[in-house]
Each structure stands twice: as structure tokens, then as C-alpha cells.
A protein has these predicted regions:
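Aliphatic-rich helix starts adjacent to a transmembrane/signal segment
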Residues: 2-53, 62-63
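Flexible, low-complexity segments enriched in proline/glycine/serine and punctuated by aromatic residues
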Residues: 15-16, 43, 49-220
Length: 220
């Protein structure tokens, strides 16, 4: 009788082991999926920092067009080209560059006004993912998810400029270059900049990188 009672006991042990193993594998799969999401978020942030730094360098190289046009014809400044209310990233300026409406300053000599438009056009393309395209299809795969870029002046010291005909001196402007994008999961809503507000549904999915840069300009 004892032998009959023990029949099937080993099979039950195997089944229990399989159940435990299945739950363990599911847990590992969940951790791997979460790790991939975290890694993707980190990659997005890294790309956003690079994009903000790129525009900061462009502005410092053409600082006279940072906020206001110098004396002469009307122009598009960096802050006017990428305002908070209509941020860059739609590809409209980059399309102007590709069709020749914006001058290619890498191949031709440009004025400071033309250089500003060239910088704005290229940055618009980078935000829109044109830096890398899939072979054969042309699909944009180089950007971050629904990226938008904004440039705003946060402060300046122009009030310290001496009245003419005092000797020429410099004043400082602080510009904030912001890059926003759409995150995977809900987090607390960002407060560093309003760039991209309302573009991603709930603001808890909006991610933001804000980069402040100081530019010096001659007093008017």
C-alpha cells in the first residue's frame, strides 16, 4: 500500500518546479523590458542634451543675431526662429533649407542673417530626425520622439549700457535653449521650460532638457 500512495509524487514535484520556473522567467522578462525602457529614456535624454549644446555653440558663434537684429534690414533672430509658442521640430525650416530657400552656409559665404537662418534650418532637421535615415525607405530614425526645440531670453544686462557717446562696451544676454520630447511613462510635469507644453497629451509625459548659455554683445 505505501508504494501505491507514493505513485505520481515525482510528477507533482516536476510540475511545481515548472510553475516556479515559469514565474521566475516571467519576472526576468519583465525586468529586461523595464531595463530597455529605462535605457531608451536615457538615450533620449542624451540626444536632447547634445541637440541643446549644438544650438548653444551655434548662437555663441553668431551672437549678434541672438535676440535682436542689428541696424539694417529685418531678419530672423534665433529667439524669433524658435519661440515657445511655435517651437522648431516640424521640419518646415529644414524643408526650406533642402529646397534652397535657406542658403547653405557650409558651401557659400553667408551674412550673419543668412547664417542664423542656416543654423535654425539645420537644427530643425536634427530635431525632426533627418540626421539618420533608413536606407531604401528614407524613414527618419535619427531623432528623438516628437522632439521640439525652443530658444528664449531669460535675462540681460543691457540696462547697464552707458548712453552715447560713451565708449563702446559689452552687455550680457542669458539664453535658454530647451529641447522637449515625449517620454514613455508618466512622471512629474517638468518646470524648467514651457517648451512643448500641450504637444504630448498629459504634461506628465513631457520630458525637457534646458541649457542656459551666456552671450555678450556690444552696447547699442
Amino acid at each position: 500500500m505505501p508504494r501505491q500512495l507514493n505513485r505520481g509524487f515525482t510528477l507533482i514535484e516536476v510540475l511545481v518546479t515548472l510553475v516556479i520556473l515559469t514565474f521566475g522567467l516571467l519576472g526576468i522578462a519583465g525586468l529586461m523590458a523595464k531595463g530597455q525602457r529605462i535605457a531608451f529614456e536615457a538615450f533620449q535624454r542624451q540626444q536632447a542634451v547634445a541637440l541643446a549644446s549644438d544650438m548653444a555653440e551655434r548662437i555663441r558663434g553668431n551672437r549678434l543675431l541672438a535676440v535682436a537684429c542689428p541696424a539694417g534690414p529685418a531678419c530672423t533672430t534665433y529667439t524669433a526662429g524658435a519661440p515657445i509658442i511655435t517651437p522648431l521640430g516640424t521640419g518646415a525650416f529644414y524643408n526650406d533649407y533642402r529646397t534652397g530657400a535657406i542658403k547653405d552656409c557650409a558651401a557659400q559665404v553667408c551674412t550673419i542673417q543668412e547664417l542664423a537662418m542656416y543654423d535654425i534650418g539645420l537644427w530643425d532637421g536634427l530635431l525632426n530626425g533627418y540626421s539618420e535615415q533608413q536606407s531604401g525607405t528614407g524613414n527618419r530614425i535619427g531623432g528623438i520622439v516628437n522632439a521640439r526645440g525652443c530658444i528664449e531670453e531669460t535675462s540681460n544686462t543691457s540696462l547697464t549700457c552707458p548712453p552715447p557717446p560713451a565708449p563702446a562696451s559689452l552687455f550680457s544676454r542669458t539664453l535658454r535653449i530647451s529641447v522637449s520630447w515625449q517620454g514613455n511613462d508618466d512622471t512629474s510635469a517638468p518646470t524648467g521650460s514651457n517648451c512643448g507644453v500641450g504637444l504630448y497629451g498629459a504634461d506628465t509625459k513631457r520630458r525637457i532638457v534646458a541649457y542656459d548659455t551666456l552671450v555678450q554683445q556690444p552696447c547699442p
